[in-house]
Amino acid sequence: MKSILSAKTLFLCSLLLGGTASADFSLDFESGGVWAGKNDVKIPGDTGDLFSLTDDLKADQPAAYFRARATWHINDRHDLSVLYAPLSMDYSGTFDRPIDFRDGVLNPNVPTQARFRFDSYRLTYRYNFIKTDRLTFGLGLTGKIRDAEISVSQPGNTLSDDNTGFVPLINFQLAWKITEQFSFLAEGDALASSRGRAEDVMAAIQWQATDNLAFRLGYRLLEGGVDSDDTYNFSLFHYAVVGATIRF
């Protein structure tokens, strides 16, 4: 029995790690500008007042952003990556009405400062179902830890709400090699449920400068939110993307 189990274990490991001798790694860095398209808030979700950070206040935009990913390309079929993707956006203005928020009240016609922070930490496994010289397509699973906070300040009064939680997502990647140097790249994480949704999707044109270095320009959409008794928040952000990938 032990010999059978050992054989099965070796077989499974060989499937996953086959070709590990040619395994390599990549580092991906992305930056650019981000614009707020929507940011609706009601906290608590069942008794608070609904307000919009983008409509009632004004966003300080575009805001600069940065994210980084490290990927272990186990072989042609299997990829394992970690991503750090922080995001913060500042808003300012005045409310035209009193707002019940968190455990207090935000007054109208008073200078108001707000900050929306949404930091994301993700671990992704992806299996490449198609892997040719011209086309790569893969699907996988992402485990995301979100660390979010909404804070609103008026003279002598600061109210904030933070939320940390785990979100499972479906990951995908499509890479189509148009010419020897240029490719179309689409990738992202997304999932929807009855209580909320999350989408982080990018489309870009990538230039293969050398065998180990590629640059890209593109667009990223970050959208989602939650609707619960504790929190109602749905936001939308548009990104102008500049990125680089180093493979070694």
Regions found by a protein language model. Give the residues of each.
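Extracellular/periplasm-exposed beta-strand and loop segments of Gram-negative cell-envelope proteins
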Residues: G37-A63, P86-D119, R146-G165, Q173-A175, ...
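Cleavable N-terminal export/targeting peptides
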Residues: M1-S26
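Short glycine/proline- and aromatic-enriched beta-strand/turn motifs that initiate or cap beta-hairpins
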Residues: S22-L87, G243, R247
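Predominantly the C-terminal beta-signal and adjacent terminal strand-loop region
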Residues: R197-R247
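Early exported N-terminus immediately downstream of N-terminal targeting peptides
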Residues: Y84, D133-R146
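Repeated loop/turn-to-beta-strand initiation elements of outer-membrane beta-barrel proteins
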Residues: R77-L80, D133-L135, E180-F184, N212-F215
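Residues on the lipid-exposed face of transmembrane beta-strands in outer-membrane beta-barrel proteins
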Residues: F29-S31, A68-W72, L123-Y127, L141-G143, ...
